[in-house]
Amino acid sequence: MKATFQVPSITCNHCVDKIEKFVGEIEGVSFIDVSVEKKSVVVEFDAPATQDLIKEALLDAGQEVV
């Protein structure tokens, strides 16, 4: 499964690193693409990962998800 999250609070590479760390810890996540320019995060994943778990990880990383 693939999901795109709009994350307007992404401003720098530190944000990218933190997002990759938090989302990458979720079992089932196979790909993460964070774009500072587009302020988006694209995640490819399989169970047990879910969109809700990914959104929670983004929030835990200090990001706003819309």
UniProtKB/Swiss-Prot annotation:
InterPro entries according to UniProt: Cu-bd, Heavy-metal-associated_CS, HMA_Cu_ion-bd, HMA_dom, HMA_dom_sf
Q: Which CDD domains match?
A: HMA
Q: Which PROSITE patterns match?
A: HMA_1 (PS01047), HMA_2 (PS50846)
Q: Which Pfam families match?
A: HMA
* Protein name in UniProt: COP-associated protein
Record's superkingdom? Bacteria
Summarizing the annotation, the consequence of altering residue 13 to D is: In strain: NCTC 11638
Q: Does the keyword section mention Disulfide bond?
A: yes
What's the stated role of this polypeptide?
A: Part of a cation-transporting system which is associated with copper export out of the H.pylori cells.
Question: Record keywords: Ribonucleoprotein included?
Answer: no
Give UniProt keywords alphabetically.
Copper, Disulfide bond, Metal-binding
